[in-house]
Amino acid sequence: MSQDDFPAPASGFVVTHFLVVSDQDRSREFYRSVFGATVLLERDPVILRLANSWLILNVGGGPTDDKPTVTLTTPPDPNQTSAFLNLRVADIAAAYADWSAKGAEFLT
């Protein structure tokens, strides 16, 4: 992966969402096939360019020497979460139809 693919901002900052996933390959393919994400790094971690942002997908881990009290893990119950992505679109009906046809599931 080239630094040009995942550049630091010239000024200010960019928010990159880090998702802890149980299956990197399945998650990478979901974001690629449903949302058209560009895969910048295949795994460990997966790095994706999605629209005008980036996603990092990695399995849980930790603690580490610099974060001895922090462990990253997927939720024990798939019906409970502490994070989600809110994707704003120009045409919600069209996005719902397109993404549903590609396998996305919606909570609402």
Model regions and ranges:
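Conserved beta-strand-loop-alpha-helix junction that forms the acyl-donor binding cleft
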Residues: 18-24
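Generic non-transmembrane alpha-helix signal with a bias for helix starts/N-cap capping motifs
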Residues: 24-25, 92
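Conserved active-site tyrosine of GNAT-family acetyltransferases
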Residues: 27-32, 99
